[in-house]
Amino acid sequence: MISVYSISLGCPKNRVDTEHLLGSLGVAVQPVEHLSRADVVLINTCGFILPAVEESVRTIVETIDDLSGLRKRPLLAVAGCLVGRYGAKELASELPEVDVWLPNQDITAWPAMLAHALKLEGAVTPGRLLSTGPSYAWLKISDGCRHNCSFCTIPSIRGGHRSTPADVLEREARDLVAQGVRELVLVAQDVTAWGEDIGAPHGLATLLERLLPVPGLARLRLMYLYPAGLTRELLGFMRDAGAPLVPYFDVPLQHAHPDILSRMGRPFARDPRRVVERVRDFFPDAALRTSLIVGFPGETDEHYAALTSFVEETRFTHMGVFAYRAEEGTPAAEMPEQVEDRVKEWRRDALMEVQAEISEELLAVHEGTRQQVLVDAPHEEWPGLHTGRTWFQAPEIDGITYVSGPGVEPGALVEADIVETRTYDLVALA
């Protein structure tokens, strides 16, 4: 057995990569809560945007400092998008204290590389060590991206789109549910693109046909649905499939004005209203989440006003807004008409205020209703209180439901009365 202290930065896809690595070393792995008790310290980094790069480097440096005072120093391994973006050779010259760099070019090789560094003798076998508890798990269905958005570094870091075969994903889904997982959350850079590169006859629907019948699965949630991929055929399949597929749509629109979408390199998304209308044609009561970028090069006051009007009209259930940052190596970083930081930040904050009012109004409708709540974990401070989620709340990015009452325990799916609503959260009694 080896003990591991792990830090996973960035998106859920990184978390899945960490879990696969730790579950595939061919020996029993014991997670520990302090690096002084570890045989190996693993940092899975993010490098998508500059603040993520800075956080990753800071985390590595702080960890090196913490390790320097230990009598028995664990092996330090660093993986993830920071390595993919800057390369192991360049990073090693700046941070020689790191023992192992795990590059993004072949994530499947990580277990063998780390096992070799640890001098482990057992055969490396595919597996996964869950870190999210019994209620939910992320299921990464593909890696890389086929799009060329002008602001994004992901294709250069993660490479082109590569789908994981359906039989592999079905087997993993069954294993996760057998461990007690109630909700599977499908993630990728573009979930709707699954199957295009491996000849799946009906694209994503082919995969869903394999996953939906998994015995014991209570919820199947789809994230990162690209606008162009939400075809009428896919939406019709999803409507007819019904439970455990939840009518929750995470669609990263990024903007609403065609001028800005064209500059972003997203011509397939130039009519976001039509995308929203199409979803609501099939799912009138759908929960809609989106992410938007403000302050993109060339965004004028008029463009921003149009975006604000779009948000007010559309009334998303959940929304994230990001101030544009110029990323080295991307076409957008070289564009003229860069927007001042103070303007970008004001636009972000103002748009989030608009969304806060919308979210509060939409959640208030649920007060007095009865909802199924999937219980995630005990509250850290209040005995008897747990945190969980309704079908319209995705883990870690949306609001939560505070729930208490008989039968409330992690992994339980309970019927509960919504007794109070807040801007983003609910309070419920089972």
From Swiss-Prot:
Sorted UniProt keywords: 4Fe-4S, Cytoplasm, Iron, Iron-sulfur, Metal-binding, S-adenosyl-L-methionine, Transferase
Ranges for domain TRAM: 364-430
GO cellular component, one term: cytosol
Pfam family, one: UPF0004
The EC number(s) this enzyme carries: 2.8.4.4
Positions of [4Fe-4S] cluster 1 binding: C11, C46, C81
Domain named Radical SAM core: residues: 131-361
Cofactors that this protein relies on: [4Fe-4S] cluster
Broadest EC class assigned to this enzyme: transferase
GO biological process, one term: tRNA modification
Disulfide cysteine pairs (residue numbers): none
Keyword 4Fe-4S applies: yes
MTTase N-terminal domain boundaries: 2-119
Keyword Cytoplasm assigned: yes
Recorded GO MF terms: 4 iron, 4 sulfur cluster binding; aspartic acid methylthiotransferase activity; metal ion binding; protein methylthiotransferase activity
Residues binding [4Fe-4S] cluster 2, per UniProt: C145, C149, C152
Catalyzed reactions per annotation: L-aspartate(89)-[ribosomal protein uS12]-hydrogen + (sulfur carrier)-SH + AH2 + 2 S-adenosyl-L-methionine = 3-methylsulfanyl-L-aspartate(89)-[ribosomal protein uS12]-hydrogen + (sulfur carrier)-H + 5'-deoxyadenosine + L-methionine + A + S-adenosyl-L-homocysteine + 2 H(+)
InterPro entries: Elp3/MiaA/NifB-like_rSAM, Methylthiotransferase, Methylthiotransferase_CS, Methylthiotransferase_N, Methylthiotransferase_N_sf, NA-bd_OB-fold, Ribosomal_uS12_MeSTrfase_RimO, rSAM
Protein localization: Cytoplasm
Functional note: Catalyzes the methylthiolation of an aspartic acid residue of ribosomal protein uS12.
Similarity remark: Belongs to the methylthiotransferase family. RimO subfamily.
Stated name of the protein: Ribosomal protein uS12 methylthiotransferase RimO
Gene: rimO
